[in-house]
Design a protein with these regions (language model features):
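Conserved N-terminal catalytic/coupling substructures associated with nucleotide/phosphate chemistry
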Residues: 1-256
């Protein structure tokens, strides 16, 4: 067997160059992004979450928005990083094509019945998507214990939230396709463009492994907000949440 040469183009070349430089997609600076274009309501929401999580010092949370971003390591020199766009800009799509979530409800014969698009920064997208899925797309079974009303969804809320966070944090946003969520009466499928760490397989994900997020700056902000653990246990938590509520196991697929 002989050596082969492979020509890299487009996003594949970009990923290769970033790896050579020891950079990640979300750590690249954005020259034309100003503090004034970021969303104050999202900063308020983040401070609320981070205070509850106790994963940041109170003094850091009382700093102004620029100081807070510095504590989150969202500056590269004088420039804000792409992670700041995804986390705190009200319209990341001005800078990142396809940075939104698309939801569709399908009949079993694959006919699309209705659909929605969820835009905004990642904190906004996750909140809106969870609300849409649990109020419009998934039908809850209603039961009662004495006078208490209990809603049981086809997918446990904890598992759904963990899967959604995983998809948003680990997406390769150089891929211009949005995250897609396909819902039927019996299934829910989340698809995002992304890559496993080099040498990893689905078996790696299903076994004990360390945390290696594709977008570490984005992941750090969600960790500080108390939204994730950052211990590489997201997949384990999804499976456990499903088992605890008596649901069938989850299927994971990865296609390069």
């Amino acid at each position: 067997s002989g050596a082969t040469n492979q020509e890299l183009k487009g996003t594949a070349l970009d990923r290769f160059m970033l790896r050579r430089l020891g950079k990640t997609w979300d750590g690249v600076p954005v020259p034309h992004l100003s503090m004034n274009s970021l969303d104050n309501e999202t900063f308020t929401l983040f401070r609320k979450y981070a205070k509850l999580s106790q994963r940041m010092y109170e003094a850091d949370l009382q700093d102004d928005n620029k100081g807070l971003l510095e504590k989150l390591r969202l500056f590269e020199g004088a420039y804000l990083k792409r992670a700041a766009v995804m986390l705190f800009h009200s319209d990341p799509e001005k800078f990142v094509t396809g940075a939104y979530i698309k939801i569709g409800f399908f009949r079993e014969d694959a006919d699309l019945v209705y659909q929605d698009e969820v835009h905004g920064n990642l904190f906004q997208q996750i909140r809106k998507t969870m609300e849409l899925l649990t109020t419009k797309y998934m039908k809850a079974v209603i039961t009662y214990e004495d006078i208490q009303r209990i809603e049981t969804f086809p997918v446990p809320r904890e598992a759904l939230r963990e899967a959604l966070l995983n998809a948003c944090i680990n997406k390769d946003y150089a891929d211009t396709s949005p995250i897609q969520i396909r819902v039927t009466d019996t299934t829910l499928q989340i698809v995002n463009g992304g890559f496993l760490p080099e040498g990893w397989t689905i078996d790696t994900l299903l076994s004990s492994h360390r945390s290696m997020p594709y977008n570490p700056d984005i992941a750090n902000a969600f960790f500080r907000a108390g939204e994730i653990e950052a211990w590489g246990r997201g997949i384990e938590r999804i499976i456990k949440a499903c088992k605890n509520e008596g649901f069938s196991t989850v299927d994971f697929c990865y296609n390069e």
